Amino acid sequence: MRHRTALMGAVAAAALIPGMALAQERERGSSGHLNMIYWQAISTMNVFLSGGTKEMNAASIVLEPLARFDNMGELTPWLVDEVPTLDNGGVSEDLKSITWVLSEGLLWSDGTEVTADDVVFTWEYCTHPEGGCAYRDRFAGVESVEAVDDRTIVVSFEDATPNPYLPFVGAGSPIIQRAQFQDCTGTRAPECTDANFAPIGTGPYVVTDFRPNDVVQFEANPNYRVPTQPYFQTITWAGGGDAAGAARAVFQTGEMDYAWNLQLAPEVIEQMEAGGRGELLVDFGPLMERIEINFTDPSPSLPEGERATRQHPHPILSDIRVREALSLAIDRELLTEIGFGPMGQPTCNFIVAPPAMASPNNDACLVQDIDRANELLDEAGWEMGSDGIRTRDGERLELLFQTSTNAVRQDFQALIQQWWREIGIDTRLRNIDAGVFFGSDPGSPDTYLKFYADVQMYASLFEGTDPTPHLEQRRCGREPQPDTQWQGQNINRYCNEEYDALWSELNREPDPDRRVELVIALNDMFVQDFAHLPLVARGRVSAASTTVGGIVMNVWDSEHWNQAEWYRIEE
Amino acid sequence: MTDASMQPSGTPPPPAEDVHDLRPPRNQWWDVWDQFKTHKGALAGMIVFISILLFVTAGPWIWAVDPGLIDIRSRNQGSSWAHPMGTDQLGRDILARMMYGGRVSVAVGLVAMLLGLLLGTLIGVLAGYFKPMDGPLMRLTDLFLALPLLPLLLILVTLFRDTLEGMFGQATGVFLLIVFAIAITSWMQTARIVRGDVLALKEREFVLAARSIGTPSRRINTRHILPNVMSPIMVSATLGIATAIITESALSFLGLGFPPDFPTWGRILYDGRDWIEQYPARVVWPGVFISLTVLSVNYIGDGLRDALDPRIRGR
Amino acid sequence: MLNYTLRRLAFAVPTVLVISLIVFLMLDMAPGDPTASLPLTIPPEVREQMRLALGLGDPVLVRYVKWLHMMVVVEPSHMIANATGWNIGVEGPRILSWQTRSPVGDIIVQRMPQTLWVVGLGYLFGILIAVPIGVISAYRQYSWFDQAGTFVSMVGFSVPTFFTGVVFILIFSVWLGWFPSMYDTTHQVRDWDSFVFQVRQIAMPVAVLALFNASQISRFMRASMLDNLNQDYVRTARAKGLREKTVVLVHVLRNSMIPVVTVIAIGIPTVFTGAIITEQIFRVNGLGDALIRAIYVSDWPMVQTITFIFAILIVLFNLIADVLYGILDPRIRYD
């Protein structure tokens, strides 16, 4: 699996080189028309109002941030000439402010000039208390955003911030035009349909026709800053159908040039790929499928308000030996092979990417060890009963295992149920509609936040390349609880003073190398406590026609981050 | 009106050849059966349907393989002696899953149809015969016709799932929920058609005659009206059972029916859809079973329709 | 008759209102969270704010009255304004979809053409096929044509559309490459070539739907014809010396159409909500697709509005069916 990813990188690099060499011959619009399909269609072009990955991808070819991450996860200047750092003086010594300077001569697609004022407006727009901006947490801790002159922006933070690259960085934090959106702040945001569907941007394309949840048409931006780009004159960005239909359209019928998010059974994808018209693009980011272990007692006999809170530790799973046994009984290689094939990698880490931050210390869990698991349970005092289920003090070893309704997850549930049965655990399975499970309605008993089950499975990730906020989620007190309306991201109610102390150190540490060490230490502490069971690192999976060149898969930003450089390979 | 149609169909005139026979008059259901037998399609449908019923009820005793047993080494296999219909992506035996899935699908079809039919006929007759009830009942029908099945199902799931699961366990809970949801959203066609026929029937001479000799309403309905709307009800019933089975699989297709770990024919078909190129059998088997069941039921309905109609019978 | 129609129309208004209130309350009770489909990178606090921005703070009845005002006053005015170019759009907020944050009315107008093309034609062809098959099957009961017709219609009815659809795509689109596997909503018919393209892209879904609809309707047609062929008036007509063609095509057909017309009229509203599954398989972004996707992401204003339009159409077509009933069958007296 690993060599496959490396190979992908090589292909990407190779694709870049002819792209560069031929850049002189190619001109804006010379590649004609591009067809793309997202089987989950685009619902709006205003990322701030949606928050969905698909909307972010579509908007990324129109709206751009000041800097974004390239395919290696490196910060790359986009609307600026250089990324501000401590070394070049762009970031202040006390880590409390960052100064961005826009490139000269930047134009919006309507021909007007991009100014620092637009950047300030973007901040005002997204932080408006009634606007419901989906990327508001990008501006968490930001005290002010000021325009020093037409091209210079100073972002000031309330506290020392070792990672100041959240506001205006990456596809989730692009710049919008004040002139277009100034009457659309707060509660009026959704009323500006025309602006939300066809925002004026600095990117390589402009929207010519937008049909929500159906199709978007783009045309090359006449004022794009690179005069020879973009190579495709027009783009049709279709939506609808299902993943199999989208894959078929690229691989077999050739109706489409690019298809997004092809979560299909591995054998199915391989068969379609044999059609030869397209190739699969896979790269691995921080997305990881895991089993969360509940440290609190979800028993329905507890009163509402105390159920699944830290007042009642879990009677079975508080014992680390049981948690380790659960982990040892799972064959992660097999799960990956069945559920994701080349689109997944078995893992034992909480932080699976960027590669430098993935801990090398936990690979032991990749090997299934039923015997050891049985030993551990024996040690913990659970004795095998005559029906093959363990008991302790008359209590049966029973677990409730919940997840969202999804074919791959139900296959995983069935497999894991069988493995856990081999070590004497009776697992009851339950699946909940994704719209309810991932909802955050405090009134619903079935959300993943309430966690009224013993273990649950889902996938999660973090944005950008900095896992600090992701690691913060597991701090004591961050768990969903009645006092916080069940909001909070410490899903398994993990609580460890050592962990909290180490995280505080990470949050203050500016030195990159030391930060990596700390991230690995935190990761190891968390997973060696078997606080949750990582299963599979999942890749981003898209497919591209063999006739389109210049595509560089990117898991750290929008997949379309270099859309301007895509071109048609002439036969 | 001829004598034949003046007679309530419960007591058809004895066939001519029986006139001189001294045996007691035959039960009318024998006549129905005689007529039914002459319909080759219906007879074939009956045989197929009984075979399917045997397959799903007695099958698991003969083919005693656990449909949930995962055998990962033999996954994605074609048909063999060990697995006559092959195995799925987890190595589960598809034949065993078809048997268990069929139980659910057939049961959903039958129960939902009966429930829907009962409700539809009752409301149709009441609305058609009793004028004061016509308006309110038909508005109720309109109302139900306008309710979309899918959101209704979602709501029913949240409101009643915990209670039903607590009372009957997860499997039975979901089953009851889906049967109820299908029935509650499928009785309206029957009601409207029955009402339409009743409206026409009650203006007919034999009903007027019955009423003029003082027959009470209930009796007119059970003896004169109901037997005469039997044929549309039968057509509705066969359509209903088919619709129920197809609705169940359609719900699974949309991810709103039975959960993926609960095999039903619709669910197996849906799960096999992505694999149609590699293993067409995985779509074809459940597809064929659904189709055969519906087909046989339709033929049975067709035969019954002819057999139950005294005007056709004995022609 | 006119009196009856007017009375029914007067009844229709409260009916529709009650339906809309029930649907509104049901959706309000429904589980599902419009922010559930967002990536988990968006923290719960931000989700809470997004939900507040959707207007979920108000009590349910306030939201219902607001919605009703927008539905019956604001949206129609904008629809008329868009269709005619008159500047009569009523000021004020419109019904906004939670997912796209844009007026629901505009999306419905956008989705209408493809639904009418595909599902409408599927229905029309279905009727056109069904009526003659039903008539001939009944007239020549138990003939080889009847047996074959019955068998084909039974098969068409028995095989689920998502099975036929997937098989059709595999054969005609993947293996043979005759038809595109997805529907291009931006395509406009301008000349012969673009018309041919339109025919190609609707061919498969229309075929699947027509087969399915024809099977259903021909069953009713045949049953109804059989009922009538044995009636006394047919014997009388024949005894009178009328030509067989006149007897069957004028007398019997007219009477047999009564229940069939009911079935056809009741089915018409489904044309508008679209055959959800067929639209999904053939990637036609019609109204049915809009409805099911709105359900997936808990976009209740969208579901509510489409449902409401559906309700109006059903009430309307039921009324039409009843009026037709009276016209076709003079024995039925409504007054």
What is each model feature region?
Chain A
Residues 29, 135-185, 209:
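Surface-exposed binding/hinge segments that line
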Residues 34-91, 124, 200-204:
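N-terminal lobe/hinge region of extracytoplasmic solute-binding protein
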Residues 39-60, 79-80, 164-174, 202, ...:
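A structural "hinge/loop" feature
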Residues 22-27, 68-71, 83, 88-89, ...:
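Extracytoplasmic/periplasmic ligand-capture domains
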Residues 9-19:
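Bacterial N-terminal signal peptides
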Residues 1-9:
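Bacterial N-terminal signal peptides that target proteins for export
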Residues 535:
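Active-site-proximal polar cores
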Residues 41-42, 105-106, 160-161, 242:
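Acidic glycine-/aspartate-rich tracts in secreted/extracellular proteins
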